[in-house]
Each structure stands twice: as structure tokens, then as C-alpha cells.
């Protein structure tokens, strides 16, 4: 069982439980690579130790569902005991009417997708359930916010702060103009590259 949180993850967990005393629906923002899934599993485990009896964790891709299932399992929670269900939003949308239990907590991984109608139904159908949205990007390209779904946002350190403290590696950002020669070279494998595959 892996229960060790980094100091910033522990701080985020404490801030979340304090925020839940005031709000039912909270979004947590942490940059990519800082352990959101590990934190998610620790939060779920602590929630189940308290008043919660059922948790649904919802993601938008099968690969994320598998990653979360593995992490939750490493934290000592198995899907066999029925208290934690990890599922894709597509599966939940098709099967929700056949599910007889109601969740005490709904966790949305990659919560920047939560404005989609398939997610909004979770707020309508399970208003008493606490909600936790986990994301690296608490904004959408269309400019819409999340205040109609999440009552509060808990933001972690910035990427620069994580790099400065040694938790993330520095990086170089390269922008390639669309339809440029560089873009075509990057997106089109050479005959030599295709022979190696």
C-alpha cells in the first residue's frame, strides 16, 4: 500500500477537506507530472475512512481508467469490495440507469471536460454527492469557466515553482507554424522511418 504523499500533495489534501466543510463541489488544479492521480487515490482512501461509503471515479479515456484503477489498487482499494468504482464517462452514460447505488463522492479526472452534457448530468442526478474535479488546466479554450459546477478552485504551485523546487524538470517549448516545412517534416515520417517500424 502506497500512502506516502509529497509535502505539496499533503497540503492539497488538507486544503481540499477543509474546503469541503464549506462547499460540496471543489476543483483541484495541479500541473501535469505532479502526482494528481496519486493524490486522488489518497483523497478517496481518506474519504472512505470517514463518512463516505461509495466513490465513483470518472475519466474520459480508457487509458486513464486503467491508470486510476492501478493507482487506487496500490493504495489498498480494490474494485472487488464495491466501494470504489472507476469508469469512463461513456460507460457511465450508457449504464447509469442500471446502477442501483448512489455515490457519496464523484471524482472527475481531467475535470476541464466537465462542462460536457454527459458530465453535467452527474450534478443533476446526484446533487447530494460531493464532487472533486482534478485537472492541470482549469480553463477551456471556449473561454467558459466552471463556476456553475465547482464552487471552489484549489490551485497548487505554478509550473515554475515546481521546477524551482526540483519536483519537475525544466523544459524547452518549441512552436512550429502550421503548414510550415518544419511541421510537414515533423508530422510526415520519412521512408527510412517507416522501414524501421
Where does each model-flagged region fall?
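Walker A/P-loop
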Residues: 23-42
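Conserved Walker A/P-loop ATP-binding site and its immediately adjacent core
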Residues: 53-70
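Conserved small/polar residues in nucleotide/adenosyl-binding loops
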Residues: 186-193
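Walker B catalytic acidic pair
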Residues: 109-110
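Inter-Walker segment of RecA-like/P-loop motor cores
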Residues: 72-97
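Conserved pre-motif I regulatory segment
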Residues: 1-26
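Post-DEXD/H (motif II) to motif III coupling segment of the RecA-like Helicase ATP-binding lobe
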Residues: 116-168
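Residues immediately C-terminal
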Residues: 113
Amino acid at each position: 500500500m502506497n500512502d506516502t504523499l509529497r509535502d505539496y500533495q499533503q497540503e492539497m489534501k488538507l486544503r481540499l477537506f477543509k474546503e469541503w466543510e464549506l462547499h460540496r463541489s471543489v476543483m483541484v488544479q495541479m500541473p501535469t507530472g505532479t502526482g494528481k492521480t496519486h493524490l486522488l487515490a489518497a483523497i478517496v482512501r481518506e474519504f472512505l475512512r470517514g463518512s463516505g461509503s461509495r466513490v465513483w471515479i470518472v475519466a474520459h479515456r480508457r487509458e486513464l481508467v486503467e491508470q486510476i484503477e492501478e493507482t487506487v489498487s496500490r493504495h489498498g482499494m480494490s474494485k472487488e469490495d464495491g466501494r470504489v468504482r472507476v469508469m469512463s464517462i461513456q460507460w457511465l452514460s450508457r449504464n447509469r440507469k442500471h446502477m442501483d447505488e448512489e455515490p457519496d463522492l464523484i471524482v472527475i479526472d481531467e475535470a476541464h471536460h466537465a462542462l460536457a452534457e454527459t458530465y453535467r448530468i452527474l450534478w443533476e442526478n446526484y446533487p447530494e454527492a460531493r464532487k472533486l474535479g482534478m485537472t492541470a488546466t482549469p480553463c477551456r479554450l471556449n473561454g467558459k469557466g466552471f463556476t456553475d459546477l465547482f464552487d471552489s478552485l484549489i490551485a497548487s504551485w505554478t509550473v515554475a515553482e515546481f521546477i524551482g523546487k526540483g519536483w519537475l524538470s525544466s523544459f524547452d517549448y518549441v512552436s512550429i507554424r502550421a503548414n510550415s516545412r518544419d511541421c510537414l517534416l515533423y508530422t510526415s515520417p520519412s521512408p527510412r522511418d517507416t522501414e524501421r517500424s
